[in-house]
Amino acid sequence: PNGWQFNIDLQNRTGTGYVYSDKFINDKDALIDLESWTNRKVITKPKLIKWKPSVLKNSWCDNVVTIGLGQGFIDPLESNGLYMVVYSITLLVKCILKGSPPKAYNRTMSKVHKDNSNYILHHYMLSQRDDTDFWRYYKKFDATKTVWDEYSKKTNEYTNLYPDAIWGQLGLYFDAPKP
């Protein structure tokens, strides 16, 4: 496959997805890949979501605060989106109660979005796959140093979705040697 395929078991269905880049495969061939991977014919028309990963520079501007996916969209996994909703609301309440300026909220949310983006990117970079141009593209990036840099940041222990222990597990899982 030319991308990241996933199944997420829910109570009433299984969510199946295929994250790919149109630089490496067209939509028609991606559907063929998806059907081949699931070993079944797609029974409902897949929802094709095209997006360019992006994040707002300032989530809080004057009296307007964006929450969750309104702040940015990095990947289609629901768990990340739900986390961003909960985290941004929790942080907003803390900032309001402490009288923190919007700049503090924006700085923290920028860090959380950057960490989320880096963590997802590292899953692609550290994959052992190299069977398609999609996966070979990510081999060009050196993830070893950045994984250990993230692991070494003590601030990760308390300030975001991916504490230092998660980065350590990522390095161990993908056998990233210490630089």
Each PLM stretch: what is its role?
Residues 4, 60, 64, 73, ...:
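Tryptophan-centric aromatic hotspots in well-structured domains and transmembrane helices
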Residues 2, 7, 12, 26, ...:
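Detector for Asparagine
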Residues 1-51, 72-83:
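Conserved FAD/dinucleotide-binding core of flavoprotein oxidoreductases
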Residues 54-117:
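Conserved mid-domain beta->alpha element of the FAD-binding
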Residues 27, 36, 84-90, 125, ...:
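Solvent-exposed, non-transmembrane amphipathic alpha-helical segments
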Residues 94, 98-179:
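Long, low-complexity C-terminal extensions of enzymes
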